[in-house]
């Protein structure tokens, strides 16, 4: 196989695949930045993403008869979307509202979560199926969500909870206490 054949059969499809994976992943990251209100970061990511898109699309449109180029383009988009979702989980920007709903007295649960640094607000309500319920509202950094959910599923498996993204929080609001040792360890990814 000469270098020209290798380039058109293997190298260009591989380049297209890698470019599309990067471009689709960057699109996921850009969407996250937009939804969290980080307009400047979204713009910078959009510039890079568009440049990659132009190159990969240009390589495909140059010769539409090359099946492997088209296949690499499509496969790269799918793989990049999955990778983008994984990146979103890793960067965990922002906060979420967690609502815990329980028909029983939540005082033990609140004490346990409070000792772990979680702030919360409790209100009483009436459920259509369970009568009297307590609803506990918590605003939690997304980076802490998996820790909170593992505690809830392990220690309170029957607890009903819902989770929603938060767009903005008042600056200076104390919603989560993290002791200095944990803050230092989390800086190093521990």
Curated annotation (Swiss-Prot):
Spell out the protein name for this chain.
UPF0316 protein Mboo_0605
Location relative to the cell:
Cell membrane
PANTHER family in the record: UPF0316 PROTEIN YEBE
Main localization of the protein described in the UniProt heading: membrane
Listed A to Z, the keywords are:
Cell membrane, Membrane, Transmembrane, Transmembrane helix
**Cellular component per GO?**
plasma membrane
**What organism, scientifically named, is this protein from?**
Methanoregula boonei (strain DSM 21154 / JCM 14090 / 6A8)
Q: Which family does it belong to?
A: Belongs to the UPF0316 family.
